[in-house]
């Protein structure tokens, strides 16, 4: 059989159930440009609808009847190299996504194409009308197309004609009255400005303009200006010389000057950053730095946990490591979990590395992200700093990845592909023979376990950099506050400490943990929280049916009004930041208060924090955004308004997250020369997690938590795969979820899976059962994250999609989901 030059293409229109590299012929005219890593337009499906794709490889294959050919090359050069293609293929196998979904995650949004379906007249209007006789609705379409100049976007046609547009369009296309083409347009275009320079040497330019200096002064001024300034933007030449654009064009025709285009990069502006002082490490920091640097120099894959108490100076160690990595001729990547932390960290790194640092995160304008990506790709950047998406920056010769606050759930993506940045970072370090550093005061239990098992190395920072003591912590019992007649949100101990700070001119941060607040029941007298008898997680309250439910195994029971332990009244816990702010203003009417949460800070995180620091505003109130990474020397008091809210949610990470949050927020106090204090308000002051956090005792917390994880088969002792079914009809979704559970149980009996002792739980409603009018039920597979399990779950997704009984429903899989 005849073979042909073909390409393997990842097609954007292919859903996960049929995703694979598709083979396409390469027309002779496109052979030179059809290389791996460029995007193409290809016909796909029975209707040969044009779809975007990315070439994965060039191959020689048999030319089969009906083979399709690529129609258009979209990129002048590859947007992904072989390493990027390999990463996309790895993500497909790991995170149950299509190859093209992985590609879109790797590339900056500015490089994405928007596809437009354009319908055009294929003949003269009068001929079209006579040919279209007998086609219902044809004349309305033709009228609209004529008004639009003979062609129109499908969206314009649908807006004007509604659902009635589809049938006449198809009929007229079949009758060759209309043509339909797909137009691909980049979301963001490159920006450039016009430059001007002398086209002849200076002496000749003066010789040609000097004689006519009086009659054509502008031409002489242009030559005089360019002779001094050299190549300059045309707008500046006109501004400084008064020459019009017409004058410049005339000079170009005369051969005096030449125009050219120069790329203009849209880079986020930073105010002038002073060069940073020499970094002086203390003995502990120096020891940690030298240990990790040895692994960078060894050029072998390694993972090190830099475990340091809050305020121990981990950032200074990061800076020194990056300095030495760059000295070795390698590049570095520094990740932070929250956008709010990026500007503060960027200023620190810019003070040492200047313009060789690029910042990447989702709050940047799309144009800025795209231009930063271009700088990185061209090798103009040695250090990339940003949130989890910065991992995909095309840095060459990578030597070091640092993940600050590695315990944060925001390192796990909630959108397809649902990747874990920690896993992707490890993949990159293995590929590049680079060192990975996880920095944290409260590492995840899985990371600490990997250290204990010898899989990771560990470097310790036990003391604060300035030798200050850790904050003194007071636990305020909210049950006692109620008994004392104070039902408010600010306890007496916290109010008294705030009064002291206001009198001393010192600042305070108040933290409100709102996660899960409206769905928790708690006894206001003894602190009892209903827990699932099987899973040891707090149950979620559903107001629609008045029941408590576990979202792992599906256990359900009626919600009681009174406490089964002491007979006290059960109460719903939680209040928003606005209500807290109102109470603070009543208590302290003269005090300045700043509020920072998701509702009030769209694009303004940095401005609020700068105001808090510059104007020394007495009180900053906020949610998760104020809990970590902030460093203000005049903050001496931190208040945690309700420690229980994150502790009693139905997630196996609840204790870990609460300990981490409390430790982090308490660590914001006393980072200057003054001793810090903290007040933790809670209904359960005897809880081990809260007591360990108050003492900043990670080791005690870890020992308790690892015992519970082993007992319940939670990570790191097993992996949890959440298999979620969603759809618009709740009954159908629940029946499909039950069917998925039974299929999973049958599949888990296979020998290659049974060895991991898998267990299938559920189905149970998702924590938020209805989103965008779609109901969600899920099963949980407790097992082993190995190749056999992932292949089985991939098969399950594909089989579910192919079953006509599941039409209109979706199934997706999460691994050790953050929520």
Tell me what each language-model feature is.
Residues 1-440, 452-468, 782, 787-819:
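Accessory, non-ATPase domains that flank or precede helicase/AAA+ motor cores in DNA-metabolism machines
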Residues 5, 20, 38, 330, ...:
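Residues at beta-strand starts and edge strands
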Residues 39, 60, 756-787:
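Short, intrinsically disordered low-complexity segments
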Residues 178, 257, 357, 475, ...:
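Generic structural signal for residues in well-ordered beta-strands
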Residues 272-282, 286-293, 299-734, 767, ...:
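Inter-lobe coupling/hinge segments of SF2-like helicase ATPases
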Residues 353, 588, 747-753, 803-804:
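Short helix-capping segments at alpha-helix termini
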Residues 594, 747-766, 807-815:
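Short beta-strand elements
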Residues 731-746:
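Extracytoplasmic/periplasmic
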């Amino acid at each position: 059989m005849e073979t042909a030059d073909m390409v393997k293409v990842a097609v954007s229109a292919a859903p996960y159930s049929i995703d694979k590299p598709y083979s396409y012929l390469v027309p002779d005219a496109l052979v030179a440009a059809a290389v791996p890593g460029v995007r193409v337009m290809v016909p796909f499906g029975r209707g040969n609808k044009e779809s975007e794709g990315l070439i994965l490889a060039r191959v020689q294959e048999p030319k089969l009847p009906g083979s399709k050919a690529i129609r258009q090359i979209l990129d002048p050069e590859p947007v992904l190299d072989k390493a990027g293609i390999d990463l996309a293929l790895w993500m497909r196998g790991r995170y149950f996504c299509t190859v093209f979904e992985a590609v879109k995650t790797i590339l900056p949004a500015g490089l994405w194409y928007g596809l437009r379906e354009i319908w055009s007249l294929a003949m003269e209007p009068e001929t079209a009308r006579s040919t279209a006789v007998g086609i219902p609705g044809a004349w309305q379409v033709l009228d609209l197309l004529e008004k639009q100049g003979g062609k129109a976007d499908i969206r314009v046609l649908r807006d004007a004609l509604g659902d009635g547009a589809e049938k006449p369009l198809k009929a007229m296309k079949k009758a060759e009255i209309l043509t339909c083409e797909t137009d691909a347009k980049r979301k963001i275009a490159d920006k450039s400005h016009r430059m001007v320079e002398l086209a002849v040497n200076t002496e000749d330019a003066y010789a040609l303009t000097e004689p006519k200096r009086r009659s054509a002064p502008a031409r002489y001024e242009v030559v005089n200006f360019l002779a001094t300034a050299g190549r300059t933007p045309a707008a500046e030449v006109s501004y400084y010389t008064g020459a019009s654009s017409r004058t410049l064009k005339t000079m170009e025709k005369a051969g005096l000057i030449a125009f050219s285009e120069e790329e203009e990069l849209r880079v986020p502006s930073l105010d002038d950053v002073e060069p940073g002082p020499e970094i002086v490490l203390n003995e502990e920091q120096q020891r940690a730095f030298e240990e990790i640097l040895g692994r960078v120099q060894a050029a072998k894959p390694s993972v090190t946990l830099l475990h340091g108490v809050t305020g121990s100076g981990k950032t200074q160690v990061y800076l020194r490591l990056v300095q030495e990595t760059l000295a070795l001729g390698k590049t570095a990547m520094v990740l932070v979990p929250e956008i709010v932390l990026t500007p503060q960290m960027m200023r620190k790194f810019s003070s040492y590395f200047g313009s060789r640092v690029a910042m990447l995160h989702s709050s940047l304008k799309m144009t800025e992200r795209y231009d930063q990506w271009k700088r990185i790709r061209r090798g103009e950047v040695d250090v990339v700093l940003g949130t989890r998406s910065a991992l995909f920056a095309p840095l060459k010769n990578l030597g070091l990845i640092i993940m600050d606050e590695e315990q944060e759930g925001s390192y796990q993506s909630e959108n397809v592909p649902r990747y874990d940045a920690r896993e992707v970072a490890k993949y990159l370090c293995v590929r590049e023979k680079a060192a990975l550093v996880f920095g944290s005061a409260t590492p995840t239990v899985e990371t600490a376990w990997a250290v204990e098992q010898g899989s990771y190395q560990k470097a310790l920072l036990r003391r604060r950099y300035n030798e200050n003591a850790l904050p003194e912590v007071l636990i305020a019992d909210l049950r006692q506050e109620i008994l004392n007649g104070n039902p408010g949100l600010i306890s007496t101990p916290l109010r008294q400490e705030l009064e002291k700070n206001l009198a001393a001119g010192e600042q305070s941060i108040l933290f409100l943990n709102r996660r899960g607040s409206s769905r928790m029941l708690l006894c206001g007298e003894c602190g009892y929280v209903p827990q699932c008898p099987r899973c040891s997680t707090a149950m979620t309250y559903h107001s629609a049916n008045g029941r408590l439910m576990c979202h792992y195994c599906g256990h359900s029971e009626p919600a009681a009004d009174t406490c089964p332990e002491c007979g006290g009244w059960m109460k719903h816990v939680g209040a928003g930041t606005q209500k807290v702010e109102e109470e603070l203003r009543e208590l302290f009417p003269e005090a300045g208060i700043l509020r920072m949460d998701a509702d009030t800070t769209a694009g303004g995180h940095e401005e609020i924090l700068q105001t808090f620091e510059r104007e020394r505003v007495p009180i900053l109130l906020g949610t998760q955004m104020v809990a970590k990474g902030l460093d203000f020397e005049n903050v001496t008091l931190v208040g945690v308004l309700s420690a229980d809210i994150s502790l009693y949610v139905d997630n196996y990470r609840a204790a870990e997250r609460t300990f981490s949050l409390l430790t982090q927020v308490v660590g914001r106090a006393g980072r200057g020369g003054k001793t810090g204090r903290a007040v933790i308000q809670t209904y359960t002051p005897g809880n081990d997690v809260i007591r360990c956090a108050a003492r900043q005792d990670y080791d005690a917390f870890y020992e308790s938590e690892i015992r519970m994880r082993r007992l319940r088969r939670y990570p790191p002792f097993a992996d949890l795969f959440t298999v979620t079914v969603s759809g618009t009809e709740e009954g159908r979704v629940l029946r499909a979820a039950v069917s998925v559970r039974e299929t999973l149980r049958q599949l888990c009996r296979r020998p290659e899976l049974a060895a991991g002792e898998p267990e299938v739980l559920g189905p149970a409603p998702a924590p938020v059962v209805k989103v965008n009018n779609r109901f969600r039920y899920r099963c949980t597979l407790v097992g082993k994250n190995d190749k056999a399990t992932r292949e089985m779950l991939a098969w399950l997704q594909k089989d579910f999609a192919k079953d006509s009984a599941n039409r209109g429903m979706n199934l997706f899989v999460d691994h050790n989901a953050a929520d």
